[in-house]
């Protein structure tokens, strides 16, 4: 927790438009020199890491920034001096001694403000009481107050269970987040698990609709338009800064360019002279390249002009001359732009086809496939992209060199459009700035079993045919024009060590992988067919990943045995021969024979498991397939491997030893792939025909297993065999990949060969009689006599010469059948395509032409390039003219490509998610709509679905496994406002919608229990409905609690992610001291030990981040993060919840920050609230019964002392005293004389009364003081409940507000009259108690004893006189026994009973009868029939039966608390009843007058005339008697009231039955309510 202080620079109150300091700090508007003069208010709130740093960071006068604590040491225990950089560092917290540095030097005029030796500022030591420090946590840590409090704020905010959050915080569980790996950071897309936690989130039964988009089979990853070409003298050149890639549309419109390296036809083989002897430093280029003049720095000045030359060996010797002189010249060479110019010239796209003869040869200069050359000092890099787009039979090789002087910091940004990069979060530094720890590419490797069949790695399959079509390394491709196929662009990337210039420019291939050698490469994509086979045909290690494996489609007519043979009987033919005597004999020969004594051996390799390799740079079809098939587990494993691969940097050679076998999946992949890349990454693969492709497929995996075993040849000679070889045996030998042992390259000059091997990275395979492929020198060599498939492996003579056994013959026979069916063995097909290729080879022109030549067919080419078919549904708004791309002009096409470019190559995208139609924060106002959409989007993809093309290049999403507080911080960061509308408001709106739905459902179920439950007999249904109601109510309460937590974040600048700490503040040293004791010991504050624990464990996590265990889901990293979390928890609140407390050596729990703050001994209650201050006093409280509610009695002695300054000022003002001293003497000598002036001073000034402990707001209240005698404070008894005080010796403190603002605030906010209700519950807190309650009860109760006595003494309650045959029976003899009364009444009378009532009543005759129902409220009034004669209404004597009379008497005996004197009953005997003691009063003044005259008692029943409202205890009462006269006047008699009405039933008089005590009580209440002062307060 922190305080956000609001200041104002003036003495006036802050205006509304003044921004809060928190907002200013967030905007960076508050400077360090701002003087904040006055504190108006402060607010407790969350603090951001930036604000916590601002508390602690400060800049010394010498410009040094201090505040960070990284050392866990405190003081030197011998000298007790603070350690530098530790928890008591004088540089951070200030000097121990005033104006002395840690060196012991005192500040003088000559000394600067900061000691130059120790760096301590010369300031006062008081700064150690308020200067703070901070700890930068390596891993985020959750604040324990918001995690383990009740309720848990984070749990309510994220709508997750508290136990799950705790398990995630302490790294015992993982959280899977769907992320996007794109450019330089991970962007979170989906919080599906949060939505699933809501019971209304998912609804079943929703079907996914099929989507139709524009589908194109020729959709490539990169787009090229001629507008991106610039005209040059030598042709068209690509502008790298505008667009890094291009796409070739049709080979018919392509102009073939002359190659760079070519030798004249005469084939001179002389040894070329050395460049050093000539003394020339020139680059030699192809004849078709223009001269480029570049200048760079060197020892002797600038380099000379680059001249045009013909021979490439001269160019190489020039480079070798620079590199062989000295390392400094080598650095100058690469520091200059000469090599950059060389690359730029060769960055054009060369497509040449020429006839190769025996004298022509190619030099594979810079022969590594694709290299990334980077130097630490010069900041220059060369990057080569290898891109293939396969066409019919011959492929067009597209190369692009990306050259740019690069800063190391922008390295990832440069490569970000090409590859999906991964960089860590800011709080988890995985990599340094060095190149070896930067992930440039995304490596997709095979699964654990390295028996990986390159059949899937090197070829793809046709849509319907189902046969092997081509390898990515092959230039031979056979297909029919009607068939569609899938293609892709493989890319290779090899980063080298940054210090390569110190010894060698490019790393040479070695037998062992040195620690400094870091080589990676992107392997080609796997290409698939759209047709599947059954799952039982392919085995996989992971049974759950079968759906993501590609399947090879065979013809339906093939037998299962053929399929099995095809998968199992894969062969690799191993050539084994002796080394030749002279390497010159083997130099650049096209063909060579195998002598008869040559023996060829082969190895049988069984492969029954198929795996895939994946590259993120793929075309549309491949992305569509993989996005639908690849599951999250493989994606996650690939991402884990990628991070570990680049993090470790291949620094340990023994880790990748070839003999080591490890069960670890990641280590196994790294070791295998490293061996594969080191063995074959720079190889030049070539295939002349389909059979050679097959041999390469079979050879490649076995070569991986052999690793560094190399081929060797027996002795060969430059004989006529090379010129006149035409036999099939020679043709077979000419189609093999021959690998020279020890990876040697041979040149005409031995010296040049050695220099070349040291200068460049050597190529391992010399490709003879085939197509040549290098990184940027492209040669498509066509042999003189094309070979057919039948002349190779399917020829009987070939099989005989290869000495194939029965099994091998069967294999080739089975393989021959499907190939023959496809028509691939026809010589005519091969001859036709080769003839076309030869014709194109001679069509070389010097003048370059654009890629798209035909302007008329431009629109058609454009439509073919981007769109395959357009499906238009019925009712669609699309018009036919919009779908016809022939109507598009060039401007429209250019605009489309520009938009597409922006889509594919976004440099700085926002939050990316896979659900492109919803909001970025994945929050919907309506939960039901979101649930339906989520169910629709997360449904299993159908094979008829297609992806949106514009979003294909945005990267691949992964399910990343996270744990610890960092994952919680990522979830909380989703509530960070991203646009105009904050995410908190969206969530609050969603919760409000959920509450409306819950309220509606709860109301429906409650109505069910009110009305419908009576018609249902099934108890089980009722229980289910009841349980559903309970669940809905619990959900509603949870939603309300969550909404209550969300509301404080709305409209404020506080972010929920600040509940996770990344910066930890350190208290000033004075608050956690180290005190030396007498016995040569020291007492250390517990906080220092807790801070030390945090620092130690923070360093542990930092060490793991810098080491191999950089992934937060490794076991070691999890444990380290858990320890750090527990250490911070113990520092904030030790032992909270179920966490184990950190104890001292004596098992005593250490005191944490919370222990120092809370409790009676805490900082607030002990040091602040209990501190003695001026203008305060303390005394015992006693009751003041005559005080008003807002008054308190203040002793005179205390009042004179408290108000003395105001009293002295008033005495001087009234000239009673002349000065301050005389006034004090007057007060001391004659205090009674100044009491009147003191009352004037106290008249409008309140005092604050406080009783400890102050547990809530009402613990301090304001009162009007009243001078009293004595030494105790008088307090109104009703306010004791707010203070929790009683009058048994409690003490209260008195405080005097000084300013007028304080007095006004005391009256308005703290006055006792304004605090009648409890702020916690809203219930009244000032209630009558003790003697007040007793007095009110005595006034309003009935005296049961006196009433009982009157029953025996008078006829007050039963005032009737009974006469029976001259005998009078007194009621007192039977009043105590109900049975006696019953028996007495039920006696049969011998004569009529005479009834006498009040004088205003009439006699009742038997002549007229009336019916009366006493049990209902409806009274039947009998009208008088005889109006002439005044008659009374009589009741029939035998009206009630004996049973009814008995019931009435039983009610009479039960209701003893009611007045019984008016209960009507019918007596069977003739008797007269009269009463003279009932008292009637017209107002309560008469009642009080009779009470004072003692005419009536306090509890005597009386009848009071009343014309206002009144209340009864009973809700319904029946009339006891109704009396009517002949004029229609009526009297309604009730036990509690009497109503007199006229003939029109208008109420004339109304009497209520009460007592004088109740009259007195009500009179006091009415007078109090009608006071003017009380009316004003209301």
UniProtKB/Swiss-Prot annotation:
Instruction: State where the protein is found.
Output: Plastid, Chloroplast
E.C. code: 2.7.7.6
Q: Which cofactor does it need?
A: Mg(2+); Zn(2+)
**InterPro entries on file:** DNA-dir_RpoC_beta_prime, RNA_pol_asu, RNA_pol_N, RNA_pol_Rpb1_1, RNA_pol_Rpb1_3, RNA_pol_Rpb1_3_sf, RNA_pol_Rpb1_clamp_domain, RNApol_RpoC1
- Provide the binding site for Zn(2+): 101, 103, 115, 118
One of the record's GO molecular function terms: zinc ion binding
What binding details are noted for the cofactor?
Answer: Binds 1 Mg(2+) ion per subunit.
- Asked if the keyword Transferase belongs to this entry, the reply reads yes
UniProt-recorded name of the protein: DNA-directed RNA polymerase subunit beta'
User: Looking at the record's lineage, which domain of life comes first?
Assistant: Eukaryota
Q: Which organism is it from?
A: Tupiella akineta
> What's the stated role of this polypeptide?
DNA-dependent RNA polymerase catalyzes the transcription of DNA into RNA using the four ribonucleoside triphosphates as substrates.
| One Pfam family in the UniProt entry | RNA_pol_Rpb1_1
Provide the binding site for Mg(2+): 1286, 1288, 1290
Give the primary localization class.
Answer: plastid
Check the record and name the SUPFAM superfamilies matching this protein: beta and beta-prime subunits of DNA dependent RNA-polymerase
Tell me which UniProt keywords the record has, alphabetically. Chloroplast, DNA-directed RNA polymerase, Magnesium, Metal-binding, Nucleotidyltransferase, Plastid, Transcription, Transferase, Zinc
Q: Return the similarity comment.
A: Belongs to the RNA polymerase beta' chain family. RpoC1 subfamily.
Q: Which GO terms describe its cellular component?
A: chloroplast; DNA-directed RNA polymerase complex; mitochondrion
Its UniProt entry gives the catalysed reaction(s) as: RNA(n) + a ribonucleoside 5'-triphosphate = RNA(n+1) + diphosphate
Q: Which Gene3D superfamilies match?
A: 1.10.40.90, 2.40.40.20, RNA polymerase II, clamp domain, RNA polymerase Rpb1, domain 3
| Quaternary structure note | In plastids the minimal PEP RNA polymerase catalytic core is composed of four subunits: alpha, beta, beta', and beta''. When a (nuclear-encoded) sigma factor is associated with the core the holoenzyme is formed, which can initiate transcription.
Broad enzyme group: transferase
| GO biological process entries | DNA-templated transcription
């Amino acid at each position: 927790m922190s305080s956000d202080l609001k200041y104002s620079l003036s003495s006036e109150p802050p205006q509304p438009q003044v921004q809060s300091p928190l907002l200013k700090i967030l905007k960076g508007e508050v400077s360090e020199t701002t003087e904040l003069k006055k504190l108006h208010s402060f607010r407790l709130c969350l603090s951001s890491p930036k604000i916590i740093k601002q508390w602690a960071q400060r800049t010394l006068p010498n410009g040094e920034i201090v505040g960070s604590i990284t050392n866990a040491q405190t003081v030197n225990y011998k000298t007790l001096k603070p350690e530098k950089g530790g928890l008591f560092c004088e540089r951070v917290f200030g000097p121990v001694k005033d104006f002395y540095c840690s060196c012991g030097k005192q500040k003088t005029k000559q000394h600067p403000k900061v000691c130059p030796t120790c760096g301590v500022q010369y300031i006062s030591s008081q700064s150690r009481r308020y200067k703070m420090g901070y700890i930068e946590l390596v891993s985020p840590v959750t604040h324990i107050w918001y995690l383990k409090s009740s309720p848990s704020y984070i749990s309510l905010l994220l709508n997750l269970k508290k136990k799950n959050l705790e398990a995630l915080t302490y790294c015992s569980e993982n959280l899977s987040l769907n992320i996007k790996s794109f450019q330089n950071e991970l962007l979170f897309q989906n919080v599906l698990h949060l939505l699933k936690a809501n019971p209304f989130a998912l609804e079943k039964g929703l079907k996914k609709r099929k989507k139709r988009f524009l589908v194109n089979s020729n959709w490539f990853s990169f787009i090229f338009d001629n507008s991106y070409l610039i005209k040059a003298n030598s042709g068209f050149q690509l502008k790298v800064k505008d667009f890094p890639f291009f796409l070739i549309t049709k080979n018919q419109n392509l102009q073939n360019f002359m190659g760079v390296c070519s030798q004249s036809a005469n084939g001179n083989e002389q040894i070329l002279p050395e460049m050093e002897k000539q003394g020339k430093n020139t680059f030699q280029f192809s004849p078709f390249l223009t001269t480029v003049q570049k200048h760079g720095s060197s020892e002797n000045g600038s380099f000379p002009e680059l001249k045009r030359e013909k021979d490439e060996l001269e160019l190489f010797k020039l480079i070798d001359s620079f590199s062989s002189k000295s390392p400094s010249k080598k650095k100058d060479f690469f520091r200059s732009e000469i090599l950059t110019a060389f690359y730029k010239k060769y960055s054009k796209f060369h497509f040449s086809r020429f006839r190769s003869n025996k004298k022509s040869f190619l030099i594979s200069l810079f022969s590594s496939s694709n290299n990334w050359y980077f130097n630490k000092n010069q900041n220059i890099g060369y990057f080569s992209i290898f891109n293939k787009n396969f066409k019919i039979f011959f492929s067009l090789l597209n190369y692009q060199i990306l050259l740019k002087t690069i800063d190391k910091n922008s390295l990832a940004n440069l490569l970000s459009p090409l590859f999906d990069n991964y960089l860590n979060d800011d709080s988890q530094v995985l990599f340094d700035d060095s190149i070896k720890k930067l992930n440039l590419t995304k490596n997709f490797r095979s699964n654990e079993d390295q028996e990986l069949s390159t059949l899937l790695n090197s070829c793809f399959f046709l849509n319907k045919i189902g046969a092997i079509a081509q390898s990515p390394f092959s230039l031979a491709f056979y297909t029919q024009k009607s068939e569609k196929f899938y293609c892709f662009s493989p890319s290779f990337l090899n980063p080298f060590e940054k210090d390569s210039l110190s010894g060698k420019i490019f790393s040479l291939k070695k037998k062992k992988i040195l620690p400094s050698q870091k080589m990676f490469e992107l392997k080609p994509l796997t290409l698939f067919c759209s047709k599947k086979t059954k799952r039982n045909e392919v085995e996989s290690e992971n049974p759950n990943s079968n759906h993501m494996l590609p399947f090879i489609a065979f013809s339906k007519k093939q037998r299962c045995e053929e399929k099995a043979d095809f998968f199992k009987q894969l062969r690799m033919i191993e050539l084994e021969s002796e080394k030749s005597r002279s390497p010159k004999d083997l130099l650049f020969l096209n063909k060579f024979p195998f002598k008869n004594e040559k023996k060829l051996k082969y190895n049988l390799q069984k492969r029954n498991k198929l795996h895939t390799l994946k590259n993120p740079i793929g075309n549309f079809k491949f992305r569509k397939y993989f996005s639908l098939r690849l599951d999250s587990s493989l994606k996650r494993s690939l991402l884990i491997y990628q991070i570990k691969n680049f993090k470790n940097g291949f620094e340990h050679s023994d880790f990748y030893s070839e003999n080591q076998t490890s069960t670890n999946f990641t280590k196994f992949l790294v070791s295998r792939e490293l061996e594969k890349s080191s063995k074959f990454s720079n190889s030049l693969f070539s295939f002349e025909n389909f059979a050679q492709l097959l041999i390469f497929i079979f050879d490649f995996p076995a070569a991986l297993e052999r690793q560094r075993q190399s081929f060797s040849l027996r002795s060969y000679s430059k004989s006529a065999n090379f010129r006149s070889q035409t036999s099939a045996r020679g043709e077979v030998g000419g189609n093999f990949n021959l690998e020279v042992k020890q990876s040697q390259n041979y040149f005409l000059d031995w010296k040049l060969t050695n220099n070349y091997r040291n200068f460049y990275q050597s190529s391992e395979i010399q490709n003879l009689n085939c197509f040549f492929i290098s990184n940027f020198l492209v040669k498509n060599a066509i042999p003189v006599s094309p070979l057919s498939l039948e002349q190779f492996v399917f020829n009987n003579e070939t099989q005989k010469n290869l000495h194939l056994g029965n099994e091998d013959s069967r294999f080739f026979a089975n393989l021959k059948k499907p190939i023959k069916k496809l028509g691939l063995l026809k010589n005519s097909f091969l001859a036709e395509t080769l003839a076309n290729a030869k014709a194109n080879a001679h069509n070389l022109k010097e003048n370059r032409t654009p890629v798209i030549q035909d302007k008329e067919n431009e629109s058609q080419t454009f439509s073919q390039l981007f769109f395959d078919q357009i499906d238009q549904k019925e009712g669609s708004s699309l018009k036919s003219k919009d779908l016809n791309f022939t109507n598009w002009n060039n401007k429209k096409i250019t605009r489309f490509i520009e938009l597409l470019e922006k889509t594919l190559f976004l440099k700085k995208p926002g939050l990316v998610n896979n659900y492109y139609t919803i909001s970025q924060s994945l929050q919907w106002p309506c939960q039901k709509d979101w649930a339906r959409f989520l169910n629709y989007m997360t449904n299993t993809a159908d094979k008829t679905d297609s992806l949106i093309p514009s979003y294909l290049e945005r990267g691949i999403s992964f399910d990343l496994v996270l744990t610890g507080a960092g994952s919680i911080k990522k979830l909380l960061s989703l509530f960070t406002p991203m646009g105009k509308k904050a995410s908190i408001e969206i969530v609050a709106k969603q919760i409000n919608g959920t509450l409306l739905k819950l309220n509606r459902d709860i109301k429906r179920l409650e109505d069910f229990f009110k009305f419908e439950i009576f018609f249902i007999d099934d108890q089980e249904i009722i229980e289910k409905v009841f349980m559903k109601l309970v669940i809905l109510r619990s959900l509603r309460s949870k939603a309300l609690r969550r909404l209550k937590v969300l509301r404080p974040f709305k409209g404020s600048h506080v972010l929920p992610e600040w509940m996770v700490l990344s910066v930890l503040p350190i208290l000033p040293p004075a608050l956690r001291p180290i005190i030396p004791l007498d016995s040569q010991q020291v007492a250390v504050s517990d906080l220092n030990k807790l801070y030390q624990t945090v620092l130690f464990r923070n360093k542990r996590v930092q060490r793991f981040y810098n080491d191999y265990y950089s992934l937060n889901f490794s076991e070691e990293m999890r444990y380290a993060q858990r320890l750090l979390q527990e250490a911070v928890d113990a520092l904030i609140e030790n032992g909270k919840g179920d966490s184990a407390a950190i104890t001292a050596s004596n098992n005593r729990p250490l005191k944490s920050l919370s222990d120092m703050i809370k409790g009676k001994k805490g900082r607030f209650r002990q040091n602040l609230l209990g501190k003695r201050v001026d203008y305060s006093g303390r005394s015992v409280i006693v009751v003041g019964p005559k005080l008003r509610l807002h008054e308190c009695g203040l002793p005179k002695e205390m009042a004179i002392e408290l108000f003395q300054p105001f009293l002295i000022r008033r005495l001087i003002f009234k000239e009673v005293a002349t000065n301050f001293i005389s006034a004090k003497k007057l007060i001391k000598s004659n205090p009674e004389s100044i009491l009147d002036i003191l009352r004037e001073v106290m008249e409008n000034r309140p005092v604050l009364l406080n009783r400890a402990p102050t547990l809530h707001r009402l613990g301090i209240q304001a009162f009007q003081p009243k001078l009293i005698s004595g030494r105790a404070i008088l307090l109104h008894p009703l306010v004791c409940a707010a203070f929790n005080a009683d009058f048994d010796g409690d003490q209260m403190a008195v405080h005097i507000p000084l300013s007028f603002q304080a007095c006004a605030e005391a009256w308005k906010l703290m006055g006792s009259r304004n605090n009648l209700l409890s702020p916690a519950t809203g219930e009244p807190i000032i209630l009558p108690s003790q003697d007040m309650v007793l007095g009110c009860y005595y006034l309003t109760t009935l005296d049961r004893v006196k009433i009982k006595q009157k029953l025996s003494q008078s006829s007050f309650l039963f005032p009737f006189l009974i006469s029976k045959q001259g005998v009078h029976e007194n009621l007192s003899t039977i009043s105590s026994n109900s049975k006696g009364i019953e028996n007495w009444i039920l006696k049969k009378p011998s004569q009529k009973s005479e009834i006498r009532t009040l004088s205003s009543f009439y006699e009742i005759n038997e002549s007229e009868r009336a019916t009366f129902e006493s049990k209902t409220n409806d009274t039947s009034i009998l009208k008088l029939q005889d109006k002439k004669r005044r008659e009374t209404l009589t009741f029939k004597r035998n009206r009630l039966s004996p049973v009814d009379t008995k019931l009435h008497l039983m009610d009479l005996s039960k209701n003893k608390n009611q007045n019984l004197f008016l209960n009507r009953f019918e007596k069977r005997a003739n008797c007269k009843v009269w009463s003279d003691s009932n008292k009637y009063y017209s107002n309560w003044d008469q009642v009080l007058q009779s009470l004072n005259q003692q005419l009536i008692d306090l509890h005597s029943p009386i009848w009071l005339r009343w014309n206002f409202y009144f209340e009864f205890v009973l809700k319904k009462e029946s009339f006891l008697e109704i009396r009517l006269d002949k004029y229609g006047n009526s009297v309604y008699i009730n036990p509690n009231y009497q109503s007199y009405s006229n003939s029109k039933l208008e109420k004339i008089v109304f009497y209520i039955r009460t007592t004088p005590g109740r009259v007195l009580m009500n009179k006091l209440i009415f007078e109090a309510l009608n006071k003017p002062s009380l009316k004003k307060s209301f």
